[in-house]
């Protein structure tokens, strides 16, 4: 169903069966999740040692399972009736860890919450994770652009020094102004971001150990 141009609101829930006196409620949201980034070429150096991946820091507007959208630089909203399968930072952390494992270039990777002894820690800030409406010249029903933005830091745990910092940005236009197509655009943009971060982590860590 094409999304309305104004804020997305749930339609009223259907009547309860029979003569129940329970109040009517909204149906649970439809859940969506993103997929693991396909591994790029495994050629080149691998990161030596254990890598811990911290939960990305995110502003409160993004630290939620709601799927975010913007219509201007100063507005923030969410799609109605749908949600991510987990809070966005936790979902991204899980995808980043799985993608690192599948890459073949980071043989030892885990969540930082496990408090394992490690050689490296990856700290990230989730700066943008939203669908953007209102591009110049776009009509009210035009499909949005998905924007994902990360700031990443690689910490050498032996001396707790940040050995590198990287900004990763991806923009992907949805093929249609419908939630499944918008989620597909999130998926593609997230793949680009994760593959870029993996390549940067391996290159930065490998250079620091030479």
Question: Can you name each region flagged by the protein language model?
Answer:
Residues 3, 7-21:
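N-terminal export signals
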Residues 77-83, 158-199:
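Short secondary-structure boundary motifs at beta->alpha junctions and helix caps
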Residues 97, 101-105, 198-202, 206:
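Sec-exported extracytoplasmic/periplasmic mature domains
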Residues 47-49, 63-65, 72, 80, ...:
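Envelope-exposed proteins and targeting segments
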Residues 22-41, 103-159:
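Surface-exposed short loop/turn segments
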Residues 20-90, 204-210:
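A structural "domain/chain start" motif
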